């Protein structure tokens, strides 16, 4: 499960991918977490736009006021779940990031680790949205990531952003087949556990 990530200067990072940015500025967020408004790329007829959407999706059909917002959707079942099957077909988005956090469970403790691309390029998370909310798509952890956690966000290359947003392609099949970037990670301070902590020190190796 992906529940925290880092995003710095999203407007600059997506300048070659979008035509405009709406209510998004070049800021630095070292502890992006659910229920925050975060930069997401959406496709319109006249081009892509970078918008601020709330991380955590409550489907339109959910009438229970206590329904918990969904922050992740499993790639393996996204075409089957009533919450997601229409969204992966018609409402795809891409969240931009620099890296993300995962926690390794060790006996009674969980230790945070920070993941980035090995080539240092920006990270693009595949997602889905409904109105002003979005969630990230996850898959089984690959290679060394599984040492820390059994799930990971689906990450696509910048060259595949336009393809994923192309609704003529079958979204889940594309995500299963496309090339994924290599990731590296290191242990970080448990200060990241507190959502209100937000500084560059959170991503420093300990």
Name every feature range the model reports, one short phrase each.
Residues 1-206:
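Short linear sequence motif anchored by a di-proline
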